[in-house]
């Protein structure tokens, strides 16, 4: 009898222990905490029907490209009907841009992406609509329109921000970004309900979340913005508990931290600048100290924050162009942010070294599948200025070169998937006398990783306390190890497991 009682108690203890360990090992951790995102401009990516405009079926055909690169989630830039090429002036929130395909194509994309364990989030642009959206057309037509209060109107032109008010026969309307993108009036409860309805529609189609365009501009008041996003996020979680929202709050770290009161994730613009400028100056400008400070700051407002890290996006000069065409510096910048905790967002073409600068169209040029640009999937909706036929910037040339940006990214992402410390570990700077050496360690449970970069164009030496064994080296580029010493070549990176 005593033996049976002992066995029973032991089994109960084991069950409780296993349950506890399963919990603390992140079994219930949100999927996005370990995601690797790829931002894709559908128009420029892959054409399936020969009209030279990228489309959803082209994306479907290229899902294995993402899978092979270890991409686990896609952010689709706007895919709704719109007037402009970029899609940020929406005319219908419940349909697909006809140049991109049909709703059936979209549903097929969601299904096939999910079959390959690739999540999809949409760019949700709700700060404003197109001036040709039926809501605004009606709103501008009459004082008595049921949609009049969907937008912000004034009978007279206000003195404050007068350049942001535009005239119609029925009054002046407010448009922050452009006259043809009038701002919605979120003080109107009907507008807030419309936005929830839109999001619900796409979640029911199978999307996994949204990138929130212009998240800090919904109201001209941060506290009201935060309250709205809190309300919106709470509503979506009631429909889809694991929904992912990431805000575009293009501001300093203090402002971004405030928005963590309402959102689970925000893009880390200041960190991006810190990394890019450090590589450009060949000197660590305090990347890790800054990141540690930010993470503490973000955690004060949201203990479960998910930091969205990146180098550049669709509004900024491309990475390689920023570095004057330098492949080594482009690889180094990628090596840094892809070995930091957070959720990395890769801008399409970054991984093959595409170039581009303002105006915006030329930051969003066609993805080059082959150097001659004759692939059947090649888009050509705009004549490129930077990524021209025969200039060597293309996937096929990158794949063949073992030292290419593409193969470097592929290897780094493979390591990131295997080593969870890189995504979610506690990070700590390893002090060095020379600021051209950036060294840090990441720790998660029993996994410890050390990363060392040489930001300089000249050789450097890094001394470590313990001997570095070959079996513990996860990645080494342009460097070599000698017992407890690393000889770092120009713009080199070493990733190693440590005791």
Swiss-Prot record:
Listed name of the protein: Alpha-amylase 3
Binding of Ca(2+), residues: 127, 183, 217
Alphabetical keyword list: Calcium, Carbohydrate metabolism, Cytoplasm, Glycosidase, Hydrolase, Metal-binding
This protein's GO CC annotations: cytoplasm
Site (Transition state stabilizer): 315
Disulphide connectivity of cysteines: none
Miscellaneous: The profile of production of reducing sugar from soluble starch by the action of AmyC was intermediate between those of AmyA and AmyB.
SMART domains: Aamy
InterPro entries documented for this protein: Alpha_amylase, Glyco_hydro_13_cat_dom, Glyco_hydro_b, Glycoside_hydrolase_SF, O16G_dom_2, SusG-like_C
Active site: 213, 248
Family membership noted in the UniProt record: Belongs to the glycosyl hydrolase 13 family.
GO MF terms held by the record: alpha-amylase activity; metal ion binding
Cofactors demanded by this protein: Ca(2+)
Catalytic activity: Endohydrolysis of (1->4)-alpha-D-glucosidic linkages in polysaccharides containing three or more (1->4)-alpha-linked D-glucose units
Hydrolase among keywords: yes
Domain of life: Bacteria
Keyword field contains Metal-binding: yes
EC numbers: 3.2.1.1
GO biological process: oligosaccharide catabolic process
Pfam families: Alpha-amylase, SusG_C
Subunit structure: Monomer.
Cofactor note: Binds 1 Ca(2+) ion per subunit.
UniProt-annotated location(s): Cytoplasm
Organism: Dictyoglomus thermophilum (strain ATCC 35947 / DSM 3960 / H-6-12)
């Amino acid at each position: 009898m005593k033996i049976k009682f002992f066995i029973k108690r032991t089994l109960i203890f084991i069950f409780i222990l296993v349950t506890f360990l399963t919990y603390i090992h992140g079994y219930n951790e949100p999927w996005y905490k370990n995601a690797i995102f790829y931002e894709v401009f559908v128009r420029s990516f892959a054409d399936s029907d020969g009209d030279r405009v990228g489309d959803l079926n082209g994306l479907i055909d290229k899902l294995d490209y993402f899978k092979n690169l270890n991409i686990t989630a896609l952010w689709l830039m706007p895919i709704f009907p719109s007037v402009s090429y970029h899609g940020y002036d929406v005319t219908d929130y419940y349909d697909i841009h006809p140049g991109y395909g049909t709703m059936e194509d979209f549903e097929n994309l969601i299904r096939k992406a999910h079959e390959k364990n690739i999540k999809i989030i949409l760019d949700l642009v709700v700060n404003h609509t197109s001036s040709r959206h039926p809501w605004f057309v009606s709103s501008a037509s009459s004082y008595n329109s049921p949609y009049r209060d969907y937008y912000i109107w004034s009978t007279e032109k206000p003195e404050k921000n007068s350049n942001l008010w535009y005239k119609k026969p029925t009054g002046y309307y407010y448009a922050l970004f452009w006259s043809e993108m009038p701002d919605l009036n979120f003080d109107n409860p009907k507008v807030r309900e419309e936005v929830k309805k839109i999001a619900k529609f796409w979640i029911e189609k199978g999307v996994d979340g949204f990138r929130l365009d212009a998240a800090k501009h919904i109201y001209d008041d941060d506290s009201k913005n935060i309250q709205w996003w809190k309300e919106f996020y709470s509503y979506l979680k009631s429909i889809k508990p694991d929904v992912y929202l990431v805000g575009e709050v293009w501001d300093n770290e203090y402002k971004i931290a405030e928005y963590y009161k309402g959102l689970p994730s925000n893009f880390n613009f200041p960190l991006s600048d810190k990394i890019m400028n450090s590589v450009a100056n060949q000197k660590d400008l305090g990347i890790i100290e800054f990141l540690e400070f930010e993470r503490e700051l973000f955690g004060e407002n949201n203990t479960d924050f998910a930091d969205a890290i990146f180098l550049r996006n669709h509004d900024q000069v491309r990475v390689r162009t920023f570095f004057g065409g330098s492949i080594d510096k482009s690889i180094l910048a990628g090596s840094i942010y892809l070995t930091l905790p957070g959720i990395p967002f890769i801008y399409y073409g970054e991984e093959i070294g595409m170039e581009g600068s303002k105006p915006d169209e030329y930051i969003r040029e066609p993805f080059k599948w082959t150097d001659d640009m004759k692939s059947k999937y090649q888009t050509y909706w705009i004549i490129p200025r930077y990524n021209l036929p025969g200039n060597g910037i293309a996937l096929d040339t990158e794949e063949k070169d073992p030292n290419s940006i593409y193969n470097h990214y592929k290897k780094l992402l493979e390591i990131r998937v295997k080593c969870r410390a890189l995504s979610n570990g506690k990070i700590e700077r390893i002090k060095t006398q020379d600021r051209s050496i950036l060294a840090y360690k990441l720790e998660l449970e029993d996994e410890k990783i050390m990363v060392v970069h040489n930001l300089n164009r000249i050789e450097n030496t890094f001394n470590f306390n313990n001997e570095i064994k070959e079996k513990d080296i996860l990645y080494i580029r342009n460097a070599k190890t000698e017992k407890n010493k690393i000889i770092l070549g120009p713009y080199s990176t070493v990733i190693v497991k440590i005791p």
